[in-house]
């Protein structure tokens, strides 16, 4: 759940000129989805980085801190520093009837040292306590990819991704041509294991 400014700076550092307005994030997609489906003024419990909190406020959602504040929705986004108590509050809120939204289902994310748990692992913690799945805004769901094509005015995009189960599947779900790169969680050996 990095801010678009961080991603744009990263792309620019790699030699790809980019402005924050060129970046569409799953954090933007999930807060937009909640605002569209539930409306402004919706109380949301956020289990994600402060960037998601900021985006929620920009969309006139009202972040709350605990299930006892009766949130109407829970928004989960990746947070490498998530506290266990935050996941517990998310579980309590969903158990009490709050709608559950997530930015992406990535079980892992690559680092220089190897794979680490991703948002999908954090979702599994809450999921172990409830009887439903979250509504997904990011890949492989369509909202993020459609928002990207709309914002950039793409007519025949090629989606580049390093995860077969989210990036490439998401492109396929949206009818977008994809290019699989070997820089992330999946490699050549996974092509025969994951059927898309």
Region locations from a protein language model:
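Active-site phosphate-binding/coordination module
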Residues: 1-66
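Conserved small/polar residues in nucleotide/adenosyl-binding loops
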Residues: 194-196
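Short, well-ordered secondary-structure micro-motifs within conserved domains or adaptor modules
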Residues: 68-81
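Histidine/lysine/aspartate-rich catalytic loop segments that bind and position anionic ligands
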Residues: 99-123
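Conserved Lys-Pro-Asp/Glu-containing loop-to-beta segment of HAD-superfamily phosphomonoesterases
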Residues: 134-169
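Acidic, Mg2+-coordinating phosphoryl-transfer loop and its flanking beta/alpha structural elements
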Residues: 56, 61, 160-192
């Amino acid at each position: 759940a990095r801010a678009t400014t961080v991603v744009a700076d990263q792309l620019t550092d790699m030699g790809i000129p980019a402005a924050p307005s060129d970046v569409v994030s799953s954090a933007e997609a999930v807060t937009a989805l909640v605002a569209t489906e539930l409306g402004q003024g919706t109380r949301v419990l956020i289990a994600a980085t402060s960037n998601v909190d900021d985006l929620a406020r920009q969309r006139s959602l009202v972040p709350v801190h605990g299930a006892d504040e009766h949130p109407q929705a829970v928004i989960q986004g990746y947070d490498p520093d998530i506290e266990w108590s935050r996941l517990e509050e998310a579980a309590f809120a969903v158990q009490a009837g709050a709608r559950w939204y997530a930015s992406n289902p990535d079980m892992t994310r690559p680092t220089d040292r190897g794979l680490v748990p991703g948002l999908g692992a954090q979702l599994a913690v809450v999921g172990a306590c409830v009887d439903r799945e979250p509504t997904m805004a990011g890949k492989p769901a369509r909202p993020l990819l459609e928002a990207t094509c709309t914002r950039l005015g793409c007519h025949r995009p090629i989606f580049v991704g390093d995860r077969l189960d989210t990036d490439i599947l998401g492109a396929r779900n949206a009818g977008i041509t994809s290019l699989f790169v070997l820089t992330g969680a999946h490699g050549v050996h996974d092509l025969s294991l994951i059927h898309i």
